[in-house]
From Swiss-Prot:
Region (Domain I, interacts with DnaA modulators): 1-83
Transmembrane segments: none
Coiled coil residues, start to end: none
Binding partners and assembly: Oligomerizes as a right-handed, spiral filament on DNA at oriC.
Pfam family, one: DnaA_N
Descriptive protein name: Chromosomal replication initiator protein DnaA
Function: Plays an essential role in the initiation and regulation of chromosomal replication. ATP-DnaA binds to the origin of replication (oriC) to initiate formation of the DNA replication initiation complex once per cell cycle. Binds the DnaA box (a 9 base pair repeat at the origin) and separates the double-stranded (ds)DNA. Forms a right-handed helical filament on oriC DNA; dsDNA binds to the exterior of the filament while single-stranded (ss)DNA is stabiized in the filament's interior.
Record note on domains: Domain I is involved in oligomerization and binding regulators, domain II is flexibile and of varying length in different bacteria, domain III forms the AAA+ region, while domain IV binds dsDNA.
Region entry Domain IV, binds dsDNA, spans: 344-463
Example GO molecular function: lipid binding
Length: 463
């Protein structure tokens, strides 16, 4: 990282170290290329009344940072000084400012040796966007959220959920919850040693330790922590030596009453090319799935993001995004950011027509249009009932339950109204459909087998 000058007024001297930390964290998290493109020429100008004022070199850079990174920058400032309430970005320096120049530290997370990875620099590996406060909770993720929160808030060495195993598809919130656990512990119990990393990095560090004959240091590093969080554990499938080391690390931490949190794209029982003894241990504690989002959850996520970004978006645009971008949360938020950025840069109003044009490529890639008829056929086949049973009034459990599941999936995977869905199921009214959806949601709270079954049906339908 090249030396960067940071400018601030005399009255902002108490924020000198804060800005240097914020700038360094932006560099660590986003990397040199992105940092140099957007942040390297941003100066700290002034602070007053709990507001930090930054100066961007051009209107374009200012608008881009405001649309993409303003919340990240504010949260970073608040991490170091919680009296800061807002960040303002301008393009012209304030008159009469007395400038003090400092140099950013040049050490990055990549330069930190393995022996230094402790509670003091866990912050470098955590994304400031991912906290419990901005995690939107709904039926698909409420168990995982509650379990993650319990782990973070536990006053004992470990929670009752040890290990906590979170699984689900890409972009549904598993990584968000793991970062949120790390943030909560960092802020409320800073003396606890926490390691968060991907299984891929765990493997690379292990291989490096073998090559450099530093295996003892590697073992000491991972087996002396209070909380170990490993993301995407499926990466070690088929990696025999890494599995062996993970197995012994896992056992040591459990034996020493330390907390473990694991994430994966599938349940422990569905992992291939991994030893049975590891599978067994991964399921010792609480296994919580994060399944595909419902329309209501997607709507809540969009409304939360819009409020955070302090922008106004028409309701029909929000409804359109929630109905059309159904694959995962990451893609949903990306679509929202793209619409807002386009409006900022072109100064065009956000309308449904503009949104459809801006996202046409993304919508085309999502264009595996799922119909109620598709859902009825797949569910009927899965449960070995007649397709005609979907529109019948038969109340036998072996028929009624699949029909309720099909109604739930129709509401989750299609933009159809309750009334429209009811028509497809033998002209049933919207209250019948609403009752079916509510019944399935209640069952999903405690029935792990049903959650896995519905996840599987969603994957089949979406692919």
């Amino acid at each position: 990282m090249s030396t960067n000058q940071i400018i601030l007024t005399d009255q902002g001297d108490n924020y000198l170290n804060v800005w240097s930390h914020v700038a360094q964290d932006l560099y660590n998290h986003y990397g040199e290329t992105l940092y140099n493109s957007w942040f390297s020429k941003v100066n700290f100008i002034e602070s007053s009344l709990n507001t930090v004022i930054l100066c961007a070199p051009t209107n374009f850079v200012r608008d881009w940072i405001k649309s993409k990174y303003s919340m990240v920058i504010l949260q970073l400032f608040q991490h170091y000084n919680n009296t800061i309430k807002s960040v303002e970005i301008i393009t012209k320096e304030l008159p009469g400012t007395s400038k003090t120049v400092i140099e950013l530290p040049t050490k990055t997370f990549a330069d930190i040796g393995s022996s230094e990875l402790n509670a003091e620099n866990i912050f470098s590996t955590l994304d400031v966007r991912f906290t419990f406060d901005n995690f939107v909770v709904g039926v698909p993720n409420e168990l995982a959220y509650a379990a993650a929160r319990a782990v973070a808030e536990s006053t004992d060495a470990v929670s009752e959920s040890n290990p906590l195993f979170l699984y689900g598809g890409v972009g549904l919130g598993k990584t968000h919850l793991m970062h949120a656990i790390g943030w909560y512990i960092k802020q409320n119990n800073p003396n606890r040693k926490v390691i968060y990393m991907s299984a891929e990095k765990f493997m690379y560090q292990f291989v490096k330790a073998l090559r450099n004959k530093e295996v003892i240091s590697f073992k000491e590093k991972f087996r002396s922590v209070d909380v170990l969080m490993i993301d995407d554990i499926q990466f070690i499938c088929g990696k025999d030596s890494t599995q062996e080391e993970f197995f012994h690390t896992f056992n040591t931490l459990i034996d020493n009453n330390r907390q473990i949190v694991i994430s994966c794209d599938r349940s422990p029982s569905d992992l291939d090319n991994i030893e049975d003894r590891i599978k067994s241990r991964l399921g010792w504690g609480l296994v919580a799935d994060v399944h595909s989002t419902t329309y209501e959850l997607r709507l809540g996520i969009l409304e939360s993001k819009i409020e955070q970004m302090n922008v106004k978006i028409p309701k029909n645009v929000i409804d359109f995004l929630a109905s059309k971008i159904v694959s995962n949360v990451r893609e949903l938020e990306g679509a929202l950011n793209k619409v807002i950025a386009h409006s900022n840069f072109t100064l065009k109003e956000i309308t449904l027509e503009n949104t459809q044009n801006i996202l046409r490529d993304l919508l085309r890639s999502n264009e595996r249009i799922i119909t109620v008829e598709d859902i009825q056929k797949k569910v009927a086949s899965r449960y070995n009932i007649k397709l005609s049973d979907m529109s019948s009034s038969r109340r036998l459990r072996e028929v009624a339950r699949p029909r309720q599941i099909a109604m739930y999936l129709s509401k989750t995977l299609t933009p159809k109204s309750l009334a429209d869905i009811g028509k497809k199921f033998g002209k049933k009214d919207h209250t019948t459909v609403m009752h079916a959806i509510k019944k399935v949601e209640e069952l999903l709270e405690n029935d792990i087998e049903l959650r896995e079954e519905i996840n599987l049906l969603m994957k089949i339908l979406q692919n």
